[in-house]
Regions:
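Conserved residues at the C-terminal ends of beta-strands
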Residues: 274
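Active-site-proximal, substrate-binding regions of enzyme catalytic domains
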Residues: 2-267, 277-376
Length: 376
């Protein structure tokens, strides 16, 4: 099983359809809500002069490349943040939080969870056919509004109350350090929560219970109490500090959406992007067990793999992707192989090949999965 990878829209747009197939095959992609928002935003753009493709055509092309076999749409960060503050554990690296799980028991009484197709997955399937629903445009607009319609005077006042003076910050590393130090401290917990409530637009009816719950625990550092909520606050503080210190341009509105991809870093092994803001800022948030990969470099290696595997015989290709290439071809000097060696789940057999999977084993696996899917 391949590494879990977070990607942005710029990376997927850069791929050919064939390259996107190999990306979906060799990785477990995190389809973030930001990708959904950015893709739908293209519908509002004007058709480029001289181009034969309409905005709807452009979105259909992106939908054709969207990972559907291995990837999964991720729950919105605000919902994850609220759940974490209410006592639910946050997922860890390598776990994609997916909505809609239904607990069932299979034919032999074994417990399992069935996930129906998410609205986002169904939407991308329709977009491939050129069908767009107005409700999706509204949803994307609401998500975008959450990122752009902030009460800036309130946020500035709360940041000052926390003793933060962004103008003294000289680098993105310093901005990260200031934000990290705060969420790991017990300093002004009410102000910290006030900022977090403003950033995620916390529903009013939940605020008192969240404050009470943290108070009952003795106001430990937010990073120890609700690690994912602390991460969201840390990203938001980092961005506001970096803006005020002129480390990030305030003249580019898309920076607000771009930085929001960092909310989903805790779930991935790899973040791949072709965005310069991501290249500068994402590495300070990554652990030693995670990597940032520049989009052009991964695209080049996917193109190499496509050339090599398309040069195989028709008979070999007809056997399917999992038989043709259970692992990325190449040695440790190639990007995909090195990423797999560091991040892929499980270890290869001695000869580097996957163990054989017989037709009988495949049949039993299908029956096992179907027993869950058909369970009430």
């Amino acid at each position: 099983m391949g590494p879990v990878v977070l990607f942005d829209k710029s990376f997927l747009q850069s791929l050919s359809v064939d390259e996107s197939v190999w990306f979906d095959h060799f990785f477990l992609p995190v389809v973030s809500p930001l990708f959904f928002v950015e893709t739908l935003a293209d519908l509002t753009k004007q058709q480029r002069p001289g181009s034969l493709r309409t905005p709807e055509d452009e979105v259909r092309v992106i939908a054709d490349k969207t990972p559907v076999l291995s990837g999964a749409p991720c729950v919105h960060h605000s919902q994850l943040c609220i759940a974490n503050l209410l006592g639910h554990h946050a997922p860890h690296v390598g776990q994609i939080p997916v909505a809609g799980g239904r607990p069932v028991r299979g034919a032999e009484g074994k417990p399992g969870v069935v996930f129906e197709n998410s609205p986002e997955a169904e939407a991308f399937a329709r977009w491939q056919r050129g069908r767009f629903h107005e409700v999706e445009r509204d949803l994307a607009s609401n998500w975008r509004a959450m990122l752009s319609e902030l009460n800036l005077p309130e946020i500035a006042q709360r940041i000052r109350a926390l003793g933060i003076t962004p103008q003294t910050c000289k680098s993105v590393e310093e901005a990260y350090g200031i934000a990290a130090a705060l969420v790991h401290s017990r300093y002004e917990p009410q102000q910290q929560l006030g900022l977090l409530f403003a950033f995620v637009q916390m529903p009013a009816y939940l605020r008192a219970s969240i404050v009470h719950r943290w108070s009952e625990a003795g106001f430990p550092p937010l990073a120890h109490y609700a690690s994912y909520a602390a991460h969201v606050l840390q990203v938001e503080l980092f961005f506001q500090i970096a803006l005020a210190a002129n480390l990030i341009s305030a003249d580019r509105p898309s920076n607000r959406v771009d930085i929001a991809y960092l909310f989903y870093l805790p779930f991935c092994h790899i973040f791949v992007s072709g965005d310069k803001l991501h290249r500068r800022c994402a590495p300070v948030f990554l652990t030693k067990q995670q990597d940032f990969v520049w989009a052009a470099e991964l695209k080049d290696d996917l193109a190499r793999i496509n050339r090599e595997l398309m040069a195989t015989s028709e008979v070999e290709r007809q056997q399917g992707l999992h038989t043709l290439a259970p692992r990325p071809p190449g040695d440790s000097s190639t990007l995909l192989v090195s990423l797999w060696e560091k991040h892929a789940f499980g270890s290869p057999s001695e000869d580097g090949a996957e163990p054989p999977f017989s037709h009988e084993a495949q049949r039993k696996l299908v029956e096992h999965v179907n027993s869950f899917a058909k369970a009430p």
